[in-house]
Amino acid sequence: MGRIGTPVFLAFLSALTCSLQVHAQVRDLKQCSNDPEFGRYCPTTCGVADVLSKYAKGVDEDSSFIDSVLTQLAAKHGIVEGNVNIVNEDVRITRDEAQIIKDSGQKTVQKILEEVRILEQIGVSHDAQIQELSEMWRVNQQFVTRLQQQLVDIRQTCSRSCQDTTANKISPITGKDCQQVVDNGGKDSGLYYIKPLKAKQPFLVFCEIENGNGWTVIQHRHDGSVNFTRDWVSYREGFGYLAPTLTTEFWLGNEKIHLLTGQQAYRLRIDLTDWENTHRYADYGHFKLTPESDEYRLFYSMYLDGDAGNAFDGFDFGDDPQDKFYTTHLGMLFSTPERDNDKYEGSCAEQDGSGWWMNRCHAGHLNGKYYFGGNYRKTDVEFPYDDGIIWATWHDRWYSLKMTTMKLLPMGRDLSGHGGQQQSKGNSRGDN
């Protein structure tokens, strides 16, 4: 489609302008001008009509073209506007996704920081566990070393006496206790059968014979080879091993001890040995156990003598003004881990892992846990209480003794041959 040239379009605009001006003047004068110059500089109406007629077709074509262009522009504008909306939506979505990513990133960072904190706590906990395990390993190594030495000693002993049997070492001499065995001709320490007056059948015991006195041994600790964490029935019937020499560990049994001490008055001697191989003892008069119906209650009339001190009478540990009262053993019932007869709101026997005449709890405990070397600490025990073999009037409660022996002799026997160790009754610590 052709377009109006620029000169023609300008001439058209000039003529139109002049015509409008003349029309305005004629309107103002309300009459036509007869001026002969009229139309010289400004085309007349007829001239304008000619020009319009001449270029009207081109103007119409250009107008149509312009309309077409405008229509196309409008369409393109709609497309552009749609694209802009799409872009805006994409921007919004992108912003939302960016916010989500930001939030997720913050959560991830927080999670990582929390995991780092947890790992730090685990690290601290592991350090403490490593230290604890290291200490346990050290203690176990010491224990293994001692066991290895004991194994060597046992093998050496076996190599010397493997031909001997317990059966061949039991003497045929018998009696109601070891003193009667001596009275009936027994001369050497060893294994004998005795039958207390009310016993239904005889039972085997170790008799320690010295200077004409026959001691009936009811308990012995020697090397930790026997576990003293036992129940009520085991302590009632007895456990451990009897040997021709006093080199094994055992508990004779509460029922047997009751039968023995119920037939006459007996002296109880407690022999103690520490890890420096120092020996001390404590003697009690008229020692006896009541029957099982009374929970094998412990009785004695007095502390006779000894250089180990009277731990059965209790001891002031300095923890409580009533420590001595809480730790006396006179009149106490026998307790085992599963049969609690003590005066404590907890269970002394369960915490200590053994049977004994517990109060709340004890000052002397010869059935406690065996600790090699003597000294032990709170960190070595399951509960924060002393559970070793203790005699508080000699060594403190965190020292476990090496060897103990509990033995009975009828009251009234002459003990002048006991190394001149007759002493008056005392209550001071034996190691002061």
UniProtKB/Swiss-Prot annotation:
Keywords: Blood coagulation, Calcium, Coiled coil, Disulfide bond, Glycoprotein, Hemostasis, Metal-binding, Secreted, Signal. One of its GO terms (molecular function) is signaling receptor binding. Its main location: secreted. GO terms for cellular component: fibrinogen complex. Disulfide bonds join C178-C207, C348-C361. Residues 169-412 form the Fibrinogen C-terminal domain. InterPro entries: FIB_ANG-like (IPR037579), Fibrinogen-like_C (IPR036056), Fibrinogen_a/b/g_C_1 (IPR014716), Fibrinogen_a/b/g_C_dom (IPR002181), Fibrinogen_a/b/g_coil_dom (IPR012290), Fibrinogen_CS (IPR020837). Transmembrane segments: none annotated. Gene3D superfamilies: 1.20.5.50, Gamma Fibrinogen, chain A, domain 1, Gamma-fibrinogen Carboxyl Terminal Fragment, domain 2. GO terms for biological process: blood coagulation, common pathway; fibrinolysis; platelet aggregation; positive regulation of heterotypic cell-cell adhesion; protein polymerization. Residues 421-432 have a biased composition (Polar residues). Ca(2+) binds at D340, D342, Y344, G346. Residues 1-24 form the signal peptide. PANTHER family: FIBRINOGEN ALPHA CHAIN, FIBRINOGEN GAMMA CHAIN. Heterohexamer; disulfide linked. Contains 2 sets of 3 non-identical chains (alpha, beta and gamma). The 2 heterotrimers are in head to head conformation with the N-termini in a small central domain. Together with fibrinogen alpha (FGA) and fibrinogen beta (FGB), polymerizes to form an insoluble fibrin matrix. Has a major function in hemostasis as one of the primary components of blood clots. A long coiled coil structure formed by 3 polypeptide chains connects the central nodule to the C-terminal domains (distal nodules). The long C-terminal ends of the alpha chains fold back, contributing a fourth strand to the coiled coil structure. This is Fibrinogen gamma chain. The gene is FGG.
